[in-house]
């Protein structure tokens, strides 16, 4: 990625007008950046639990498989609305506690509220009148959905100000800025590994015996215990960072321009003047996320439903089989995060040798193949159950094959989290556009496809029998198309 690196080293960090950026006299010490970046571990711990456990959990509460994807709509919606809005207002916050710390503290408190609503949804629903033998626990689902949406809003409230705080601490130093973001990414990987490890441990509820209740079985209690650990970690890291790291109070300069175009006005205005290279980048990014999102939504559900043959709406034996698959799926996600972290360390070296767009195109082929291979793994698991019996666990070969797919997918996921943003920076630098504005436009190419998938993947799966494979196949096709587009039209 020599072209990217050269432009990053040559170009100064984008300093916006004095109305939105406070630049300290000099960069803060590395230990303060580490303290702020460590909050990412707490954020990502909870996000890992969301990805691995919450889709199966809401089905255990009675929400049909085909409708569960609609609950995930808040993620892309809040990414589209909340994060840029919070960023816009945190740039202009005049609180005596600083610009970033009030938003980070608010986000952490919202996470705590959301975790209580999600973890105790079954208990709250039972207290409010849900019967234990009801197929759909309406009140519990209501508490869950409210908590789930609050959690997505809270995560977006936290992440933007945390990254902005790191930018403030870097004080415009390009090397410090790259280092701070690398540390943030490292702690994201740490949080992922911890979250998926916790989600794959089946006896976590024994640490918190009060989590098992009449309305909350062992799977539910494990989820509740995971979230208790998650919020404890986040609150501790947040308190340490906000106490230890100073966030200077901001006040606008007397000559600053207070009649600025609002953030969304800038975003939509950018589309009018956007040049072809950026449009092509948006197209590849959108196709890439259409490929990824069905798997991110239903990866552990696939393991519990198709690979292990369980059923979240079945009898106790089928539920136990399903939950077993979910736990193994969480292990797969942990392996995915480990590979992602390792791959993130070598992206720069590989990109320098073959180029960013070739690397992105190549790993999208890997993504397409892995998503297509889920069909083969599923068919092998079904054939095994026909021979060994409906309740038979998958063979070691089938289980290891599924886990291998999770691990290998860490390679293209690492590229998805880095190359598009690097290319957006290059294009914006060459065209004279602002870095923040270009990344805001790129974010729309991520969240809008996620909303499309959230609306469409459940009904598509239901149309073809109610499993997860149709969505994965659509993802494989989108990944293949994105690979071709990346290799042929990206600059």
Swiss-Prot record:
Report the locations given in the UniProt record.
Cell membrane
Q: Where is the composition biased (Basic and acidic residues)?
A: 1-12
Q: Which reaction does it catalyse?
A: sucrose(out) + H(+)(out) = sucrose(in) + H(+)(in)
State the GO CC annotations.
Answer: plasma membrane
A Pfam short name: MFS_1
Which CDD domains does the entry link to?
MFS_SLC45_SUC
Looking at the UniProt entry, the stretches that span the membrane are: 34-54, 69-89, 102-122, 140-160, 182-202, 225-245, 278-298, 330-350, 359-379, 407-427, 444-464, 469-489
> What results from gene inactivation?
Early flowering phenotype under short-day conditions.
First-listed, main subcellular location of the protein, grouped into a coarse class: membrane
UniProt family annotation: Belongs to the glycoside-pentoside-hexuronide (GPH) cation symporter transporter (TC 2.A.2.4) family.
Q: What is this protein called?
A: Sucrose transport protein SUC9
Q: Which gene encodes it?
A: SUC9
């Amino acid at each position: 990625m020599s072209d990217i690196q050269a432009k990053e080293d040559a170009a100064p960090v984008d300093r916006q007008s004095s109305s939105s950026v406070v630049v300290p006299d000099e960069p803060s010490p590395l230990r303060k950046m580490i303290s702020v970046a460590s909050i990412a571990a707490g954020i990502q711990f909870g996000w890992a639990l969301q990805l691995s456990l919450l889709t199966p959990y809401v089905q255990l509460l009675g929400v049909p498989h085909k409708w569960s994807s609609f609950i995930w709509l808040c993620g892309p919606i809040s990414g589209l609305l909340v994060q840029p809005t919070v960023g816009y207002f945190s740039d202009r916050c005049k609180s005596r506690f600083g610009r970033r710390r009030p938003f980070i503290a608010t986000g952490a408190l919202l996470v705590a509220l959301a975790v209580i609503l999600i973890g105790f949804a079954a208990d709250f629903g039972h207290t409010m009148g849900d019967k234990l033998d009801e197929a759909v626990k309406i009140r519990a689902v209501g508490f869950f959905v409210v908590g789930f949406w609050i959690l997505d809003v809270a995560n977006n409230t936290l992440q933007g100000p945390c990254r902005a705080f790191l930018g403030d601490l870097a004080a415009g130093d390009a090397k410090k800025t790259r280092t701070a973001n690398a540390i943030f990414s490292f702690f994201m990987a740490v949080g992922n590994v911890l979250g998926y490890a916790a989600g794959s441990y089946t006896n976590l509820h024994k640490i918190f015996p009060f989590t098992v209740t009449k309305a909350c079985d062992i799977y539910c209690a494990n989820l509740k215990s995971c979230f208790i650990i998650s919020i404890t970690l986040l609150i501790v890291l947040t308190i340490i960072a906000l106490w230890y790291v100073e966030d200077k109070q901001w006040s606008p300069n007397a000559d600053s321009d207070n009649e600025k175009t609002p953030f969304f006005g800038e975003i939509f205005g950018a589309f009018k003047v956007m040049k072809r290279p950026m449009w092509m980048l948006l197209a590849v990014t959108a196709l890439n996320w259409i490929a990824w999102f069905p798997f991110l939504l239903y990866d552990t559900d696939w393991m519990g439903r198709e690979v292990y043959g369980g059923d979240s709406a079945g009898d106790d034996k089928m539920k136990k089989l399903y939950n077993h698959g979910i736990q193994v799926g969480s292990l797969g996600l942990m392996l995915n995060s480990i590979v992602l972290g390792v791959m993130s360390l070598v992206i720069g070296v590989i990109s320098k040798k073959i180029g960013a767009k070739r690397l992105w195109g190549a790993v999208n082929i890997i993504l397409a193949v892995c998503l297509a291979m889920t069909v083969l793994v599923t068919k092998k698991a079904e054939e095994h159950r026909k021979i060994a019996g409906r309740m038979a666990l998958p063979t070691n070969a089938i289980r290891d094959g599924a886990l291998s797919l999770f691990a290998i997918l860490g390679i293209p996921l690492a590229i998805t989290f880095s190359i598009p943003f690097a290319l957006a920076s290059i294009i914006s630098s060459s065209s004279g556009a602002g870095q923040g504005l270009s990344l805001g436009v790129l974010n729309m190419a991520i969240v809008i496809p996620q909303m499309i998938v959230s609306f469409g993947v459940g009904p598509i799966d239901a149309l073809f029998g109610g499993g997860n494979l149709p969505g994965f196949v659509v993802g494989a096709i989108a990944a293949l198309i994105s690979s071709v587009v990346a290799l042929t039209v990206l600059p």
